[in-house]
């Protein structure tokens, strides 16, 4: 957006789609490690390259792959394979074939439930304060997701979910070309998602992902991310219990 916001937290960077935040995270963990890691989510390693551009979504994915991947954050860490056809019946109503959703116990858990919980929380911020805040019109607190826009506005994405439903919308041309000025994920793909999900969600009660054991909410200084002093402005953030911030801003200044 041609605006420099200075140092910001990962939560804020993700919500506002700040590319440099994602690039620095990827650089820290190493692109080769990330390339191996994404195969857990069902992505084809051959369609991605171990470079920093991975952080910007450079690579080839399908909407169905995205549904499976975001489902991991929705259900607490399990990889479930989506399917197109639930049931086939003949003209006499006899069932010829039926697909069934596997339970969590029947599917592999590919990430720590704490990881899934924190990612769920971060992706909620995208709707609460970030690029997908238009989705607040649905008036639910259990929605999370992420907008996506490729170079030259060729593709517009929105992947959004709650515990019951994952929906991914994509807009683009069969033969890649620009969608037009300002046709980003939040402008082109998100409205489709809202129109589709709003009536469907009326059939599902709001459910928040349960906080797993080993997650600690702490008050931190929003500027530096360290523990907050008692009387200073602060916000809550979630941490693994083995990776709690041990220092506060006052300690560092003195």
What spans do the regions from the language model cover?
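Conserved catalytic neighborhood of penicillin-recognizing serine enzymes
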Residues: 1-34, 79, 91-118, 123-125
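Active-site SXXK
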Residues: 13, 69-73, 119, 169, ...
């Amino acid at each position: 957006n041609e605006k420099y916001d200075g140092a910001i937290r990962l939560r804020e960077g993700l919500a506002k789609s700040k590319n440099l935040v994602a690039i620095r995270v990827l650089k820290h963990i190493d692109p080769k490690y990330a390339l191996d890691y994404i195969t857990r989510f069902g992505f084809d390693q051959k369609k991605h390259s171990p470079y920093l551009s991975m952080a910007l979504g450079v690579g080839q994915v399908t909407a169905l792959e995205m549904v499976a991947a975001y489902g991991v954050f929705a259900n607490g860490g399990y990889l479930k394979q989506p399917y197109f056809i639930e049931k086939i019946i003949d003209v006499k109503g006899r069932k010829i074939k039926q697909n069934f959703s596997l339970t969590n116990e029947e599917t592999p858990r590919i990430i720590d439930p704490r990881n899934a919980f924190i990612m769920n929380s971060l992706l909620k911020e995208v709707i609460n304060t970030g690029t997908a805040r238009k989705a607040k019109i649905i008036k639910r607190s259990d929605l999370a997701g992420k907008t996506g826009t490729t170079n030259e506005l060729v593709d517009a994405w929105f992947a959004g979910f709650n515990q019951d439903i994952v929906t991914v919308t994509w807009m683009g041309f069969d033969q890649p070309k620009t969608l037009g000025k300002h046709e980003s994920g939040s402008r082109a793909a998100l409205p489709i998602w809202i129109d589709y999900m709003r009536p469907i969600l009326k059939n599902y009660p709001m459910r928040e992902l349960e906080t797993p054991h080993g997650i600690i909410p702490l008050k931190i200084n929003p500027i530096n991310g360290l523990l907050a002093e008692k009387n200073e402005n602060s916000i809550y953030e979630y941490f693994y219990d083995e990776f709690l911030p041990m220092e506060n801003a006052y300690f560092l200044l003195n």
